[in-house]
Amino acid sequence: MKKVKIFDLTLRDGSHAKSHQFTPEQMAVLAEQIDSTGVAAIEFGHGNGLGGSALQYGFAAATDREYMEAVAPVVKNADLSIIILPGVGTRHELHLAKEFGAKYARMCTQITEVDIAEQHIKMAKQLGMIPIAVLPCAGIIPVKDTVRYTQMAESYGAEVIYLLDGGGYQLPEQTYERIAAMKKAVDVPIGFHGHNNLQLAVANSKAAVEAGAEYIDCCLKGFGAGAGNCPTEIFAAVMDRMEIDCGIDLYKTMDIAEQYLRPLMPRAMEVDNDRIMLGYAGCYSSFLLFAQRAGARYGVDPRDIIKEIGRRQCTEGQEDICIDVAYALAQKK
């Protein structure tokens, strides 16, 4: 039977949806429950990764170390994963992750800037971790360029390479085409991370698996940036229907999502106007709350901010540019 590994990102991508205000105690309770569902790995921490707690992205409720101290002891079955935006997270964060037993170190850069991650990838490997390259915004460049940057990531030592659709912009056929091309071009496994701004996260994840992806990112109830991510319980049900083993206890996952996560969610992962715009414009989902706040501050429609961010092809870590965009739009009124 074909197998797929699920990385659960409820406690990391979901942090965006809580303005990074998970407490260490909440993370510990959720991590222990998620650990019992059968996921391959659990990723946790600030939404913008280790080192992300800052004025530009939003201060977290706790430090990286405090989250590590809370989560690491309670996870007994799944592996621990962290994500770093090179330049935001440094060697110090990698050493911290290693100290607490993280197995996977994921490096996320704009796909055209994957060379920025070279040092981080090599250091993670030196520390005995499994380095993963996460490449966003592939849907806005030609497939041949996606392949070229994938090969660069492999040459740096990445042992898994992810295609990340951070805006929920891609259509399933685009996802299939890119994953298939990546799979053919390199010798390491391929993963996919989708967002649900056009309600296509499950469809895109399914297309990725059909094209050969072996790793899929999910969150309980899809809890994540923008309109959320691929919901773990829905994706697990789809995989079961397709007779693909993803290791998930479906009933337990559904029950944990309802009992433990729902009470902590500020809102359901519905698709409203601004979230639709994220997917339509190809704007990274983590920009949503920043665009809404900047729009309110300057009297500008957040959709116009999101559209301009998509046009500029900004990526995660540049969220504070929403203020500049909103100010410029306000001056044109």
UniProtKB/Swiss-Prot annotation:
Entry binding sites for Mn(2+): 13, 193, 195
Disulfide bonds: none
Residues of the site described as Transition state stabilizer: 12
Pfam families named in the record: DmpG_comm, HMGL-like
UniProt domain Pyruvate carboxyltransferase: residue ranges: 4-254
CDD domains: DRE_TIM_HOA
EC number: 4.1.3.39
Gene Ontology process terms (BP): catabolic process; L-leucine biosynthetic process
Reaction(s) catalysed (UniProt annotation): (S)-4-hydroxy-2-oxopentanoate = acetaldehyde + pyruvate
GO molecular function, one term: manganese ion binding
Keyword Lipid biosynthesis among record annotations: no
Cross-referenced PROSITE patterns: PYR_CT
Gene3D superfamilies tied to this protein: 1.10.8.60, Aldolase class I
Alphabetized UniProt keyword annotations: Aromatic hydrocarbons catabolism, Lyase, Manganese, Metal-binding
Residue numbers annotated as active site: 16
Keyword Transcription part of the UniProt annotation: no
Annotated family: Belongs to the 4-hydroxy-2-oxovalerate aldolase family.
Protein name: 4-hydroxy-2-oxovalerate aldolase
Taxonomic lineage: Bacteria, Bacillati, Bacillota, Clostridia, Eubacteriales
